Amino acid sequence: MSDMAMIRIGILIAGLLLVAAIFLFGRPKKSPQGRRVDKDDTQPRERREPVISSGVDADGMPFERSDTGAEQSELELDDQDGAGGNDVGKRPNQDFDKIVSLFVAAKAGQVLRGEDVVVAAEKTGLVFGHMNVFHRLVEGHPERGPIFSMASILKPGSFDMANIREMQTPAIAFFLTLPAPMTALDAWEKMLPTVQRMAELLDGVVLDDSRNALGRQRVAHIRDELRAYDRQHQAPPLTKSPRW
């Protein structure tokens, strides 16, 4: 199997990791009997996250993922969150209706080294925090939650700083969860240059949510989508009392 094929297989897991991550942002812990993951997944949303059946393990080899495996991944992230106790980048609530994602993938025959990813993240203004992943925060208002976040595509998606020198990943995922602490278009305009700069620093390539090279046409399409999203979610105009 070619290196690019392995990267594409690896990125498939990111969609599930993103959904699991969103459920964990600001999510109160529940007993296993109280979980309603299947019911939540059936609720209509503007964006349908990909349903996947395979991914890659820490060695870059394919592994099968079942519904039970997805729940286990969620539990692993939950445990890490409790152990770390870092709420930097935690969403104030779990409500969301759209996710916009991009990827930075290593070039053929290469990998992204954990240590290099951390250095690049710090250079681009990302902060390590909630769920042991990186976040871009609103300057001066971290309590508003992340503008966007960055995770590894390898399960469980987090960065183990104690073993960061040994970490390798074929790609990293950036995800913008809406509503964000600013307009969707403004949030995108902060995420896109960060992703592009990360790709430069890591000598990687930027991929869209379909795992294709991100081009101008796709960027323009995403901007149009987010403008429409902002129009739909803007506050209704205040009615003015008539002048007499």
Curated annotation (Swiss-Prot):
One of its GO terms (cellular component) is plasma membrane. Residues 26-244 are cytoplasmic. The keyword Cytoplasm does not apply. Residues 1-4 are periplasmic. It comes from the Bacteria. It is found in: Cell inner membrane. SUPFAM superfamilies: Cell-division protein ZipA, C-terminal domain. It is a single-pass type I membrane protein. Gene3D superfamilies: ZipA, C-terminal FtsZ-binding domain. Its main location: membrane. The keyword Transmembrane applies. SMART domains: ZipA_C. InterPro entries: Cell_div_ZipA (IPR011919), ZipA_FtsZ-bd_C (IPR007449), ZipA_FtsZ-bd_C_sf (IPR036765). Signal peptide: none annotated. Keywords: Cell cycle, Cell division, Cell inner membrane, Cell membrane, Membrane, Transmembrane, Transmembrane helix. Essential cell division protein that stabilizes the FtsZ protofilaments by cross-linking them and that serves as a cytoplasmic membrane anchor for the Z ring. Also required for the recruitment to the septal ring of downstream cell division proteins. This is Cell division protein ZipA. It comes from Xanthomonas campestris pv. campestris (strain ATCC 33913 / DSM 3586 / NCPPB 528 / LMG 568 / P 25). The lineage of its organism: Bacteria, Pseudomonadati, Pseudomonadota, Gammaproteobacteria, Lysobacterales.
